[in-house]
Each structure stands twice: as structure tokens, then as C-alpha cells.
């Protein structure tokens, strides 16, 4: 197991480091997310990642699209692994989301898109499961801290079932 740290840069670096050192062909990401769509304490498998904070719309690009990066799409799709979990679209950004994101998604995190992009570039399968800690609202920072330990326990149980 490896801890990526918080944010897209930390996640991208750790994913690259782990893949380079281990030569793995699949990376399993277990983390937390906020959602106004899914219930708190629910496990959700991410089947698509988008960037909720990439905004170069002033230059004519859609929100979520990285300019001059035609090789990799704004949305990165993942093949589901866990048949018994709800599936969701995760908007990743380097901010703690407390409002409605500008891109279509039903959960939010701070690392997933970066992991997905590194995995896609290196031809590594990514499986990502998020524990919903909060409602991605004004109380999110309080709920996240309160629910972090519960999430770790539930994610560990899922990991041990594999």
C-alpha cells in the first residue's frame, strides 16, 4: 500500500513512482470523496474522471479541457471491477469543493483524475473506489474529518475481500 498525499500533483507523482518501481499493470485507488448525489458512508466505484478545476474558458475551451492535450480526452473512462458497488463520475480538483462543480459529475475528490491520466499514459489499469465522507457542501470540512476513520475501515474491508 502507498499513500499518495493530497492533491493532483502528489497523486500523479506517487502513481508514476509506484508504477515505475513495481511494474504493476493495475493500480487500485481507495480514497474519499464528497457527493450531493450519493449517501454518506457509501462506497462508489468511479467509472469516469473529469477535471473540475481546469478552466481555460476565457480562451474558448470547455471547462475541464486541457488546452493542447488532444492525445488524452477531458474525460477518462475506467472499466468497472466491482459489480456490487454504485458507479459514479468523479470531478477532481485542487480545492475542497463545497458548491456545484462546473463539470458534470456526481462525486468530487482531489486526486483521481491525476491518477487516471498517469495510468492511461503508462497503459496501466486503474480501479478507483471512493468512500463518501460528506455532501460536498458548507459542512463538508467537518463531515470529512469526522468520517475519515469510518471510511478507512470500510475501504480496508473491501481491499481484504479481493
Each predicted region: which residue ranges?
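Glycine-rich phosphate- or other oxyanion-binding loops that anchor nucleotides, phosphorylated ligands
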Residues: 1-162
Amino acid at each position: 500500500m502507498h499513500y499518495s498525499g493530497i492533491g493532483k500533483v502528489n497523486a500523479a507523482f506517487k502513481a508514476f513512482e509506484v508504477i515505475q518501481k513495481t511494474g504493476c499493470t493495475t493500480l487500485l485507488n481507495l480514497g474519499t470523496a464528497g457527493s450531493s448525489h450519493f449517501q454518506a458512508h457509501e462506497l462508489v466505484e468511479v467509472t469516469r474522471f473529469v477535471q473540475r478545476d481546469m478552466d481555460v474558458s476565457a480562451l474558448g475551451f470547455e471547462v475541464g479541457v486541457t488546452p493542447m492535450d488532444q492525445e488524452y480526452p477531458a474525460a477518462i473512462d475506467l472499466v468497472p471491477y466491482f459489480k456490487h458497488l454504485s458507479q459514479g463520475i468523479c470531478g477532481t480538483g485542487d480545492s475542497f469543493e463545497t458548491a456545484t462543480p462546473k463539470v458534470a459529475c456526481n462525486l468530487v475528490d482531489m486526486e483521481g483524475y491525476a491518477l487516471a491520466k498517469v495510468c492511461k499514459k503508462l497503459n496501466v489499469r486503474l480501479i478507483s473506489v471512493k468512500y463518501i465522507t460528506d455532501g460536498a457542501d458548507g459542512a463538508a470540512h467537518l463531515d470529512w474529518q469526522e468520517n475519515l476513520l469510518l471510511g478507512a475501515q470500510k475501504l480496508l474491508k473491501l481491499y481484504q475481500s479481493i
